[in-house]
Amino acid sequence: MAQKSHSLSHTKWHCKYHIVFTPKYRRKVIYNQYRSSLGEIFRRLCSYKGVEIIEGHLMPDHVHMLVSIPLRISVSSFMGYLKGKSALMMFDKHANLKYKFGNRHFWAEGYYVSTVGLNEATIKKYIQD
């Protein structure tokens, strides 16, 4: 299996991350119109930053993503951007969320991240199931 590497002028990299994060209070709100909105928002925000979504799954109470993040962006700054902007965009698109979550706090603090090496196929299967 050939690994796809990314490159800059003097650098080559192959960095993939498995990321999991939850809505505030781990509420089961990621369904129907919220689910489709979040998928669209995540794809748009990732394309703005040059982040490739390899695999992703929106569960009712958490999100799994397998992503390739460029070296110029740290994982923590990307997650701050992704969670912050997606929350603002969700509250703009679905104004009724403010009654469940308060003022513009859609995601819980923190997230889980793990680097992905040779076990990429295993993690893809885990995310899909």
Which residues make up each language-model segment?
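Basic nucleic-acid-binding interfaces
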Residues: M1-D129
